[in-house]
UniProtKB/Swiss-Prot annotation:
The keyword Membrane applies. The chain crosses the membrane at residues 34-60. Keywords: Membrane, Mitochondrion, Mitochondrion inner membrane, Transit peptide, Transmembrane, Transmembrane helix. This is Cytochrome c oxidase subunit 7B2, mitochondrial. It comes from Macaca fascicularis (Crab-eating macaque). PANTHER family: CYTOCHROME C OXIDASE SUBUNIT 7B, MITOCHONDRIAL (PTHR16716), CYTOCHROME C OXIDASE SUBUNIT 7B2, MITOCHONDRIAL (PTHR16716:SF1). Residues 61-81 are mitochondrial intermembrane.
Amino acid sequence: MMFPLARNALSSLKIRSILQSMARQSHVKHSPDFHDKYGNAVLASGTAFCVVAWVFTATQIGIEWNLSPVGRVTPKEWKHQ
């Protein structure tokens, strides 16, 4: 059971957040902001940097990955007793 004070606080927060989201949606931007101008370029350059860093790490620093033993492991001869 909620106390009346907590219930009133929660209900006012819900109403306030609904009103704020309505005000945000009705607001019209007059000029593009940083994300509108450079968002895709920043995303693409960050993705390219991460891909290059991982490719370098995977190929150049000498990690032995041991992905599959097929073709590298030969079975030993079976010893009959």
